[in-house]
């Protein structure tokens, strides 16, 4: 059975890619260039797909940055530092992003005759990103199932999982986390201060494993 995975190049979606492949699906991956400052994540997504021999497509919707300003896409907005629970992190919300990405991904999945579409929303995203909440996932499941004759099924298997639990699952699957990128700033090295870096570092610490990527700051693992 064919399945499409929405792949950002970060920890969660990369783990999901390995996970779906391990279940015996014929996997296709899709990523989006939506004007994000951290577009280098797509370089890592491409490398992972090459490693796993998974067909990979990048869809350029850079125009979206003009329609939906955010600290992730607008050049003169600074990426906030801290934790996802901080109110300043709302600046990183790209309005309606996941609904747009999932809709395009669904069209791609339907064109392939895929029965399932996977994306990596997880419990740590819930406080700040409305389009990663369980209620949103359920609503999109219904909408996408009804949107075409094929009855496409949307799956978000990590929606109730913490990031450290996703990491544990990834380590079981042999995920190469050196080929993942999380930092919102998109520099040469991960900043170690933005919300996604902070969450990633905490996950590795909780699991008791050193993150294989480089950071701009010194981290006591």
From Swiss-Prot:
Q: Which GO terms describe its biological process?
A: queuosine biosynthetic process
Note accompanying the cofactor annotation: Binds 1 zinc ion per subunit.
What keywords are assigned to this protein?
ATP-binding, Ligase, Metal-binding, Nucleotide-binding, Queuosine biosynthesis, Zinc
**One Pfam family in the UniProt entry:** QueC
Top EC category: ligase
Disulfide linkages recorded for this protein, renumbered to the chain, are none
Which cofactor is essential here?
A: Zn(2+)
Mind telling me which InterPro entries this protein's record contains?
Answer: QueC (IPR018317), Rossmann-like_a/b/a_fold (IPR014729)
Q: Which family does it belong to?
A: Belongs to the QueC family.
Q: What does this protein do?
A: Catalyzes the ATP-dependent conversion of 7-carboxy-7-deazaguanine (CDG) to 7-cyano-7-deazaguanine (preQ(0)).
**What is the protein name for this chain?**
7-cyano-7-deazaguanine synthase
Q: Which organism is it from?
A: Caldicellulosiruptor bescii (strain ATCC BAA-1888 / DSM 6725 / KCTC 15123 / Z-1320)
The lineage is: Bacteria, Bacillati, Bacillota, Bacillota incertae sedis, Caldicellulosiruptorales
């Amino acid at each position: 059975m064919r399945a499409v995975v929405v792949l950002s190049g970060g920890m969660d979606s990369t783990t999901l890619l390995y996970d779906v492949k391990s279940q015996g699906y014929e996997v296709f991956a899709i990523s989006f260039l939506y004007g994000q400052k951290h577009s280098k994540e797509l370089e890592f997504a491409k490398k992972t797909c090459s490693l796993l021999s998974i067909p990979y497509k990048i869809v350029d919707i850079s125009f979206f940055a003009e329609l939906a300003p955010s600290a992730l896409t607008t050049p003169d907005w600074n990426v906030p530092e801290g934790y996802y629970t901080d109110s300043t992190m709302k600046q990183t919300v790209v309005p309606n992003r996941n609904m747009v990405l999932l809709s395009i991904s669904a069209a791609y999945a339907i064109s392939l005759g895929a029965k399932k579409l996977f994306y990596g929303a997880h419990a740590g995203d819930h406080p700040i990103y409305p389009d990663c909440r369980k209620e949103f996932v359920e609503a999109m499941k219904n909408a996408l199932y009804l949107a075409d004759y094929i009855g496409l099924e949307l799956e978000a298997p990590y929606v109730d999982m913490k990031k450290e639990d996703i990491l544990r699952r990834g380590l079981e699957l042999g995920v190469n986390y050196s080929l993942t990128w999380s930092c919102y700033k998109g520099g040469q090295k991960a900043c170690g201060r933005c919300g996604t870096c902070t969450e990633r570092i905490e996950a590795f610490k909780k699991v008791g494993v050193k993150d294989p990527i480089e950071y701009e700051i010194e981290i006591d693992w």
